[in-house]
Design a protein with these regions (language model features):
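Fe(II)/2-oxoglutarate oxygenase catalytic core
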Residues: 1-156, 164-189
Length: 189
């Protein structure tokens, strides 16, 4: 059993789908990504984004493939950590963010995905897809576990959204990185 609760699933998306999603991102109007309350500070986070993208209303190749993959691999994460279903009902939230990091760009600051702000308080898990392999850094660093998850095409990573899993991007100075990230949240019943 994985004791750091960071689930890494390789080949969660096939290469041809990853390439289609990269084309999709490159064909969209990208905006400078902010953090938390939408504030922009390039020392903290420097990224170009398509956001927020609603799962149900998008109707794109992206939503279709991400949804199918998440349905399959959420079960795998649940099976690895069965106690997760003992607390409350949860499911993927209905939006996600597509991101493009040009060389030198990145999420520089250590952060977590549930910081107590009203717009993210119900996040319980994070999911992240890498759409391309970055051989010059480009992964995600979890300092609490001294663990780096490399950016590998088709890889899905799932981890808790809380302070126990603060993380930051590892900036590539030479290569572009494409990802999608979103969250699983508690369902108010």
């Amino acid at each position: 059993m994985n004791t750091d609760f960071i689930g890494v699933i390789d080949d969660a998306l096939p290469s041809n789908i990853c390439k289609e999603i990269i084309k999709y991102i490159d064909g969209k109007q990208l905006v400078q990504g902010g953090y938390g309350n939408g504030e922009i500070d390039l020392k903290y986070k420097d990224v170009q984004e398509v956001r927020p993208v609603p799962f149900l209303d998008d109707g794109s190749i992206v939503s279709d493939h991400l949804t199918k993959s998440l349905m399959v691999y959420t079960s795998s994460y649940r099976n690895s950590h069965p106690a997760i279903d003992e607390i409350s009902s949860w499911a993927p939230l209905n939006y996600y963010t597509l991101k493009k990091y040009d060389p030198g760009q990145g999420y520089h600051a250590v952060h977590c995905e549930n910081s107590g702000m009203s717009n993210n308080i119900n996040r319980m898990l994070v999911w992240l897809f890498y759409f391309n392999t970055v051989t010059d850094a480009g992964g995600t660093f979890f300092p609490e576990y001294d663990r780096i998850v490399d950016a590998v095409e088709g890889r899905l990573v799932i981890w808790p959204a809380y302070w126990t899993h603060v993380h930051k991007g590892i900036v590539s100075e030479t290569q572009t990185k494409y990802i999608a990230s979103g969250w699983y949240g508690f369902i108010n019943e």
